[in-house]
């Protein structure tokens, strides 16, 4: 048995996609946990498994992780700030000049200012009483997510000033029936993801997938250390780099020799950046046709496939309905032929993470491939973990102000 049950609050960057990533990652790592609350902007998890904090380091779809060994409260009248801060901050209270701040997330916008004022004033007095009499408060700013309002401190500032032991950010979740308070101990490493995007030798921000999204997709595959991940449209290797970063075995294929050269160059750079020693036989990256995967691999031999075929032209402006339809129709056969080939080489119960485009047209319509109609025909089904049975595919990433969105599917072979 483990020492104690801890409560973890994760602030999400992609709502549905982030929650799905967390569930699949924890299930894949055989972590025992319970979801006690979730919303568009956060998820609250209880666990006594010490491995869970390492699992959180693998995620791409979060901003912050906080934890608490304290109980939630029904309302602010139940708040005992001295006891709460003593339990959360411990030895940090020995620092008279403690730098701290509050980030408050709520389903009810009208409660934000009242909660902020009440907790800020009570915590200031409690910190003085507990010995941090020269503490400094970092102010939060208003933000709005879909369905969630917040007074928050940006994760970059938390990373720079408010992580233990020198600082303390306290996360307050005002949920439907309870108020949860926890201390942030980890933020997403924005700089590292940015470096992986812009410092590598070859990148194209106009069409390449952001490394954070690639990390999420790798996690959605549910891959384990003994398995192999294939990207049959690998391009310059964005997805492959994230899989390598998590120490997974990878295979990359692209029909363009120039893209394979770029992918190999990026991987060599990444091995030096991350100080990873790659054997001469790994990774396996070669020129090949994604529509003929059975020419390179045995049937039922690949564990996981994660890919984003980029077959549409770069859209400089919104197309007409007619032009959008033509573009989709022109590339549809390649998508479906490749998907059919993927199914042949994929192991039973193996998973395909497929990204397909959705185009916004001049008159505001959104047009995409009829992928759903082919899934069952090819012997696939939408993958829904036990704790996410109500999820709806595709999961859309991006906003409608963009000319093209990403539709994400998590599919499993029967």
Question: Which residues does each predicted region cover?
Answer:
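Short glycine-rich phosphate-binding loop at a beta-alpha junction
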Residues: 101, 127, 136, 307, ...
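Phosphate-coordination loops involved in phosphoryl transfer and adenosine-cofactor binding
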Residues: 96-99, 226
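A gly/proline- and charged-residue-enriched helix-loop-helix capping module
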Residues: 124-148
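Active-site nucleophile-His-acid catalytic modules used for acyl/amide transfer and hydrolysis
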Residues: 102-106
């Amino acid at each position: 048995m483990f020492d104690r049950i801890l409560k973890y609050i994760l602030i999400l960057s992609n709502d549905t996609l982030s929650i799905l990533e967390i569930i699949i990652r924890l299930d894949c790592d055989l972590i025992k946990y319970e979801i006690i609350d979730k919303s568009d902007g956060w998820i609250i998890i209880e666990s006594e498994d010490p491995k869970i904090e390492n699992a959180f380091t693998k995620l791409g779809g979060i901003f912050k992780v906080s934890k608490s060994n304290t109980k939630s409260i029904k309302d602010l009248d139940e708040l005992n700030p001295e006891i709460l801060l003593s339990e959360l901050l411990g030895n940090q209270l020995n620092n008279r000049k403690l730098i701290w701040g509050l980030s408050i997330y709520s389903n009810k916008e009208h409660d934000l200012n009242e909660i902020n004022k009440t907790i800020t004033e009570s915590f200031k007095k409690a910190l003085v009483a507990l010995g941090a009499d020269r503490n400094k408060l970092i102010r939060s700013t208003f933000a709005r997510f879909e369905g969630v309002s917040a007074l928050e401190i940006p994760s970059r500032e938390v990373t720079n000033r408010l992580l233990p032991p020198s600082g303390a950010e306290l996360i307050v979740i005002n949920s439907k029936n309870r108020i949860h308070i926890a201390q942030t101990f980890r933020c997403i490493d924005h700089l590292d993801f940015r470096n992986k995007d812009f410092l590598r030798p070859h990148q194209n921000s106009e069409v390449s997938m952001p490394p954070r999204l690639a990390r999420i997709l790798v996690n959605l595959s549910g891959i384990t250390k003994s398995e192999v991940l294939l990207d049959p449209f690998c391009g310059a290797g964005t997805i492959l780099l994230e899989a390598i970063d998590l120490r997974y075995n990878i295979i990359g294929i692209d029909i363009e020799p120039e893209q394979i050269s770029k992918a190999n160059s990026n991987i060599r750079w990444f091995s030096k950046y991350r100080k990873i020693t790659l054997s001469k036989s790994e990774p396996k990256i070669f020129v090949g046709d994604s529509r003929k995967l059975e020419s390179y691999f045995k049937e039922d031999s690949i564990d996981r496939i994660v890919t984003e075929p980029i077959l549409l032209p770069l859209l400089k402006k919104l197309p007409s309905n007619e032009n959008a339809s033509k573009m989709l129709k022109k590339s549809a056969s390649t998508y479906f032929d490749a998907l059919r080939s993927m199914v042949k080489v994929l192991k039973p119960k193996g998973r395909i993470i497929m990204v397909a485009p959705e185009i916004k047209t001049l008159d505001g319509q959104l047009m995409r491939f009829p992928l759903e109609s082919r899934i069952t025909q090819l012997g696939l089904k939408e993958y829904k973990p036990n704790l996410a049975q109500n999820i709806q595919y595709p999961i859309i990433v991006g906003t409608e102000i963009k000319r093209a969105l990403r539709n994400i599917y998590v599919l499993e072979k029967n």
